[in-house]
Amino acid sequence: MQTEHVILLNAQGVPTGTLEKYAAHTADTLLHLAFSSWLFNAKGQLLVTRRALSKKAWPGVWTNSVCGHPQLGERNEDAVIRRCRYELGVEITPPESIYPDFRYRATDPNGIVENEVCPVFAARTNSALQINDDEVMDYQWCDLADVLHGIDATPWAFSPWMVMQAANSEARKLLSAFAQHN
């Protein structure tokens, strides 16, 4: 895969430039554009993934299906499709917006900061997973209600962005509705 960049944003969310992805994520990470996607199968189960230990931020942490950064000139929806192919080896239905204005800042135990405007999407797949070990070390298809209960009971066991997304009542409602409509 070619070198990825992040799209830097000002406080109003307006693009101001780009920076190489790995150079962008430091203890002083600038605000940038990302996306987060929750992927469901035909049974309405959510794919929960565990980030590879080689990941710079939050290695080994359980999270929602796929996250990433759109590239300059790339629509968020197209970036979701690209990363699902790259990380999971799957084709997906067109991503649907769940939480378009999600924004967060969090620091991992190693001091790496995520500082993102990060629209949240949901999509479906019927494809068999072909996991990219550089991205994902483990995965599990789970009932959404069980995952949400797990997040509520043990938020420390999941990525902070997943916890914050699930804490939004409207996003939670939309994810539940999405899971139920196979």
UniProtKB/Swiss-Prot annotation:
Compartment(s) of residence: Cytoplasm
GO biological process: dimethylallyl diphosphate biosynthetic process; isoprenoid biosynthetic process
SUPFAM superfamilies: Nudix
Binding of Mn(2+), residues: H25, H32, H69, E114, E116
GO cellular component: cytoplasm
InterPro entries for this protein: Idi_bact, IsopentenylPP_isomerase_typ1, NUDIX_hydrolase-like_dom_sf, NUDIX_hydrolase_dom
Official protein name in the record: Isopentenyl-diphosphate Delta-isomerase
Origin species: Shigella boydii serotype 18 (strain CDC 3083-94 / BS512)
